[in-house]
């Protein structure tokens, strides 16, 4: 298994779309900045055929220190969730490991 990084995405844009390396890096950075900004505002980000990102507020809840067993509150927080689209799930499920999808 390998890891796909932002630098890898920029390199793929350079190779497949023909952007120069600086433009490709800027496109990737801008893409993720826009997603982050939308999530910070509380918007839902829907990427058709891929999935949805959204923020959820998690309330404070009781917790326990694993070392001491002492009860302590876990603070309220905001978390990002991702739900894959049915299309993405089907494509990933149908793909054989090590062979990229042709779509």
Curated annotation (Swiss-Prot):
InterPro entries: Hist_DNA-bd, Histone-like_DNA-bd_CS, IHF-like_DNA-bd_dom_sf, IHF_alpha
Entry keyword annotation includes Transcription regulation: yes
GO CC field: cytosol
SMART domains referenced in this protein's UniProt entry, alphabetically: BHL
UniProt-annotated stretches for the region Disordered: 55-74
Keyword Chloroplast in annotation: no
SUPFAM superfamilies registered for this protein in UniProt: IHF-like DNA-binding proteins
GO biological process, one term: DNA recombination
Signal peptide range in chain numbering: none
A GO MF term: DNA binding
Keywords recorded for this protein, A-Z: DNA recombination, DNA-binding, Transcription, Transcription regulation, Translation regulation
Domain of life of the organism encoding this protein: Bacteria
CDD domains (alphabetical): IHF_A (cd13835)
Family to which the UniProt record says this protein belongs: Belongs to the bacterial histone-like protein family.
HAMAP family found in the cross-reference section: IHF_alpha (MF_00380)
Protein name in the entry: Integration host factor subunit alpha
Gene, per the UniProt record: ihfA
